[in-house]
Every structure is written in C-alpha cells, then in structure tokens.
A protein has these predicted regions:
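Short, intrinsically disordered, charge-balanced linker/junction segments flanking boundaries
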Residues: 178, 195, 200-202, 206, ...
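Hydrophobic pocket-lining residues within nucleotide cofactor-binding pockets
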Residues: 67, 188, 196-197
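Structural signature of beta-strand start/N-cap positions in the alpha/beta core
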Residues: 36, 87, 144, 188-190
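Catalytic loop of short-chain dehydrogenase/reductase
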Residues: 15-25, 96-184, 193-199
Length: 234
C-alpha cells in the first residue's frame, strides 16, 4: 500500500544493477510513494546490467556516472537537477565492491592496490558525492542522504575481508560530513544496515546461523531483506 510519502520529491539512487540489488528495490518503493528519480551507475554497469528496465518500469532517467570521479559526479548532479526540475530531496548511496574478495585474497594477505580501490568505490565515493553536492548546492534544505552499510562494520564477520574496513570508513564519513551538512543546511546524512542476507559481497561468506540471526533480533530494522530494503526509501 502506498501513502504518497515521497510525493513531489526528487531523488538520485546510486548502484541499482539488477532486480537483486537493494537499490533496485528502494527505487521501486520510492516511485510507489510518489518520488521522481534519476538512476545512476558506472557506464559499464549500465551497459551490462538491467538498469534500463528499472528506468522504464519506474519512469526514471538513467545517467551513467563513475562515483569515484569528481567530474562525473559534477555532471550527474547538474544533469539530474535539469531532468528533475530542481534541487534534490534525497540520495541513496549503494556502491560497494571488493576485488580482494572476488580474488579470494585473505585479510592477512591483501593486495593493497585492490584495497585502495575497495575503499574508493565503497566509501570514499560517498565523501566525493557529498562534497560535490554541497559545492554545487544541489540538495534542498533538510534533504536526506542515505548510504547502505553492513553489520561487519562493527562486528567480525570472517570472510567479509576489506569490505568491513570500507563500511567502517563509510559510517565515519556519514558522521563527520553529516555534522557539517546538518548544521549548515539541515541535510541529514545517515547510514542504514539491513539484516545480513545476500547483499552482493555477502554471498561469498560462510557464517554461522547465529551470526545471521543476531542482527535480526538486535537491529532497529529487524525484518527480511526485501521489506527492509524497501523501507529505507521512506
């Protein structure tokens, strides 16, 4: 059931790749609640994924941009404001990738070049996004910026590897930039984690059932992944 909670609101959603993506589910729910969207991912992801299907389904515009490149982000926010007809009310950051995990490098034998890429894509891109938005004055007063994090940012999940470091950094950026943006413009910068069930980096993990159950019991959004993900839109 929709309640028009986002009626008239303009948003940018980073990271929708296919219908298994958390960002995809958030986009669907946001549009159900009345939002207008720009969807973005890297040029390669836009070509290889099915984001165009989501755009057609939701009546959204796709703007390809590399979230690790400041010039791409500047282009993205400028074009998004033109397409949507004004400043942005909400942004979802759902960007994460670890080549160390894909290559099965253990945490005590990381490739530091790949670690740099992990941190840049999964965390520092969030700072770049916020900094560009602030310099361009692209967000409305009291806008909301949300990044997806993971329980491994503060719990040891063997196998989550350098992504745990990236999520810790992501949360630190949210606190530090949120303090500045909140005081100056009332912009709310937050992270939210879902119950740890099959976000893309997590599918390689072999963890105990108890580790999967704990966040469901203890965390504020103690609900299944699909419901949880869609709720973040609100």
């Amino acid at each position: 059931m929709a309640y028009n909670l986002l009626k008239g609101k303009r948003g940018i959603i980073f990271g929708a790749l296919n219908d298994q993506s958390i960002a995809w589910k958030v986009a669907e729910r946001a549009v159900e609640e009345g939002a207008q969207l720009v969807l973005t991912n890297t040029p390669v992801a836009c070509r290889m994924g099915t984001i165009s299907q989501l755009a057609e389904q939701t009546g959204s515009t796709v703007i390809a941009a590399d979230a690790t490149k400041v010039e791409d982000l500047e282009m993205l926010f400028s074009e998004a404001m033109q397409v949507l007809g004004g400043k942005i009310d909400f942004v979802l950051h759902s960007c994460a990738m670890s080549a160390n995990m894909r290559k099965k490098r253990p945490y005590d034998d990381l490739d530091y070049g790949l670690l740099d890429k992990t941190l840049d894509i999964s965390a520092i891109s969030f700072h770049k996004m916020l900094q560009v938005a602030k310099k361009l004055d692209a967000l409305n007063d009291f806008a909301s910026v949300l990044a997806l994090t993971y329980v491994a940012s503060h719990r040891t999940f063997f196998g989550y590897n350098d992504m745990a470091d990236a999520k810790s950094l992501l949360e630190s950026i949210a606190r530090s930039f949120g303090y500045i943006y909140g005081r100056e413009k009332g912009v709310r910068v937050n992270t939210i984690l879902s119950r740890p069930l099959t976000p893309q980096p997590a599918v390689v993990l072999k963890v105990l059932t108890a580790c999967l159950t704990l966040p469901t019991v203890c965390h504020p959004l103690a609900m299944p992944m699909r419901t949880n993900a869609q709720t973040t839109a609100l």
